[in-house]
Amino acid sequence: MPVQVLNRLPAIKILQNEDVFVMQKSRNTFKEQSSLKVLILNLMPKKIETENQLLRLLSNSPLQIDIQLLRIDGHIPKNTPVEHLNNFYCSFPDIRYKNFDGLIVTGAPLGLINFENITFWPQIEQLFLWAKEHINSILFICWAVQAALKVLYNLPKFTRKRKLVGIYQHNTINSHALLTKGFDEKFLAPHSRYSDFPKDIIYRNTDLEILAESDEAGAYLLMSQDKRLIFITGHPEYDAMTLSQEYYRDLKLGLSPKLPDHYFPQDNPNLVPKISWRSHAYLLFANWLNYYVQQNVIKHLSSF
């Protein structure tokens, strides 16, 4: 089934070239009752690239999904035209009194910045608290996990001395959870973060269950007891070349970046990396949509 996005969104042509079924809509299109409403707060620097990545994963489902992109007002992005945000994104006042079936909050390059020094931190706090009352299921990715743990569980920020970056092997701990249904016992997924998520702190101070983890990267997939909050500390949405692009970007900035672990063939950055986590990413997002976003909608409707 298709994803529905606003007319002329750049991702449309890219996804259609990949035989992904995309439906276009105007801002005034009335949503069909059979569609799931999914809101995406896109905090990544290359927003158009992230749109492509997430829409590709969300389209791999029998469900029809109505996508709404959300921006932070007052924040001027450096890597995305303002016109793109004005044309395809809404602001918080536009959706304040609406409800959505799902919310995705992306990562952001803010791992070394204290929360109080982030100019739009008050908007993040407001959105997360609002989401608990207006969203059936929320998916936090990478930095958004750290931000959500602060806002929703009052956990302090934990930062690694060196950036964790690469493709790491993970172990499925709870194979009976619907979110991990069909997961291999061992699977690969990318990480690119300074954030750290100590297991002992999480277990002592939250109701979260760790569903999958990595010996090298630590906790990867977590879920709240009520199953409405889902946390992914890595970047399963990344394309094959995303870590490479980040590596060369940091080289140009003179940051002496660490070579991503287990990523470039023969650890040679001149060789083209292969994607080894695609099936995991598709399955993870499909499970989220099928068993948490849609099922919560069905439960809500059946309560009337």
Curated annotation (Swiss-Prot):
Record-marked site positions (Important for substrate specificity): S192
Mention any one GO cellular component term assigned to this protein in its UniProt record.
Answer: cytoplasm
Which pathway features in its UniProt record? Answer: Amino-acid biosynthesis; L-methionine biosynthesis via de novo pathway; O-succinyl-L-homoserine from L-homoserine: step 1/1
Q: Which domain of life is it from?
A: Bacteria
Active site, per annotation: C142 (acyl-thioester intermediate), H235 (proton acceptor), E237
Annotated EC: 2.3.1.46
- Compartment list: Cytoplasm
GO BP terms: L-methionine biosynthetic process from homoserine via O-succinyl-L-homoserine and cystathionine
* Residues the entry annotates as binding substrate: K163, S192, R249
Gene3D superfamilies in alphabetical order: 3.40.50.880
Please give the Gene Ontology molecular function terms for this protein.
homoserine O-acetyltransferase activity; homoserine O-succinyltransferase activity
Q: Which residues cross the membrane?
A: none
Q: Which InterPro entries match?
A: Class_I_gatase-like, HST_MetA, MetA_family
Which UniProt keyword terms apply here? Acyltransferase, Amino-acid biosynthesis, Cytoplasm, Methionine biosynthesis, Transferase
Q: Which reaction does it catalyse?
A: L-homoserine + succinyl-CoA = O-succinyl-L-homoserine + CoA
According to UniProt, residues marked as the site described as Important for acyl-CoA specificity are G111
Q: What family, per the record? A: Belongs to the MetA family.
Q: What function is annotated for this protein?
A: Transfers a succinyl group from succinyl-CoA to L-homoserine, forming succinyl-L-homoserine.
Check the record and name the NCBIfam families matching this protein. Answer: metA
What name does UniProt use for this protein? Homoserine O-succinyltransferase
* UniProt source species: Blochmanniella pennsylvanica (strain BPEN)
